[in-house]
UniProtKB/Swiss-Prot annotation:
Protein name as it appears in the record: Cation-efflux pump FieF
Similarity comment: family membership: Belongs to the cation diffusion facilitator (CDF) transporter (TC 2.A.4) family. FieF subfamily.
SUPFAM superfamilies (UniProt xref): Cation efflux protein cytoplasmic domain-like, Cation efflux protein transmembrane domain-like
GO cellular component, one term: plasma membrane
Organism whose genome encodes this protein: Escherichia coli O127:H6 (strain E2348/69 / EPEC)
Cellular location(s): Cell inner membrane
Transmembrane segments annotated in the record for this chain: 12-32, 39-59, 82-102, 114-134, 156-176, 178-198
Domain of life according to the entry: Bacteria
Function: Divalent metal cation transporter which exports Zn(2+), Cd(2+) and possibly Fe(2+). May be involved in zinc and iron detoxification by efflux.
Membrane topology: Multi-pass membrane protein
């Protein structure tokens, strides 16, 4: 695992924790001053943000540790556990928003000064957009599942802050139940994001194969190599930033072992150039044994 990956992922986790802490302080004041249930919803979400981002920070540092005798494949799955924990945090906040929104829908309470809430929400919106932009850049560079989960969480915050602005504006003109209705809508969106995030984390923990596009790229690389007659048993998975790729290459029976090994090494290097940092295992099979084993070439 390269140093660049660790540096970028750690910075993203630290930035998220710092931003969530700042926004929490701002929203505590805004809720105390206005009494807005939508701002209370945002405040609770910021509390969840801090817990999730702190979890991310600790887990990311653990996942960056190199493989050892007890963890031969590294600690990358810790990122998936962090994403799963985040989905649980977010689901809890969504439930709280439902209950609070229903309470204020039944008994609406006028806000003291919606103008202050509007200003605070605009500041929160700008700060969150900056953070999401940085996280998106980090995800493009690292493909970190933990940072991607955090980014999806803060993307929902952008939507939430936009909805809060609209709710505050409507409340300003006397639509006091709009505040509670938007809190319910925000809760639904947050719950959806949490379920999607949890599903992706579970799939990673269950060793889901790489996307079809990436597997096809691997097959195309193998098919383009001289000396390779076919291939079968492509197996892939991902743990943290590391892709694990296994494939059997079919070669002519008459090919010397040294040359077959050389071809396999060249294919491995080609795959690593396309997917840096991957763990690639290649097995060479004589063409004559493939039909007897009941295998079917992926290149035919």
């Amino acid at each position: 695992m390269n140093q660049s990956y660790g540096r970028l992922v750690s910075r993203a986790a630290i930035a998220a924790t710092a931003m969530a802490s700042l926004l929490l302080l701002i929203k505590i004041f805004a809720w105390w001053y206005t009494g807005s249930v939508s701002i209370l919803a945002a405040l609770v979400d910021s509390l969840v943000d801090i817990g999730a981002s702190l979890t991310n920070l600790l887990v990311v540092r653990y996942s960056l540790q190199p493989a050892d005798d007890n963890h031969s494949f590294g600690h990358g799955k810790a990122e998936s556990l962090a994403a799963l924990a985040q989905s649980m945090f977010i689901s809890g906040s969504a439930l709280f928003l439902f209950l609070t929104g229903i309470q204020h829908l039944v008994s609406p309470t006028p806000m003291t000064d919606p103008g202050v809430g509007v200003i605070v929400t605009i500041v929160a919106l700008i700060c969150t957009i900056i953070l999401v932009s940085f996280q998106r850049w980090v995800v493009r560079r690292t493909q970190s599942q933990a940072v991607r989960a955090d980014m999806l969480h803060y993307q929902s915050d952008v939507m939430m802050n936009g909805a809060i602005l609209l709710a505050l504006g409507l409340s300003w003109y006397g639509w006091h139940r709009a505040d509670a209705l938007f809190a319910l809508g925000i809760g639904i969106y947050i719950l959806y994001s949490a379920l999607r995030m949890g599903y992706e984390a579970v799939q990673s923990l269950l060793d889901r194969a790489l996307p079809d596009e990436e597997r096809q790229e691997i097959i195309d690389i193998v098919a383009s190599w001289p000396g390779v007659s076919g291939a079968h048993d492509l197996r892939t998975r991902q743990s943290g930033p590391t892709r694990f790729i296994q494939i059997h290459l079919e070669m002519e029976d008459s090919l010397p072992l040294v040359q077959a090994h050389m071809v396999a090494d060249q294919v491995e290097q080609a795959i690593l150039r396309r997917f840096p940092g991957s763990d690639v295992i290649i097995h060479q099979d004589p063409c004559s044994v493939v039909p007897r084993e009941g295998k079917r070439s992926m290149l035919s």
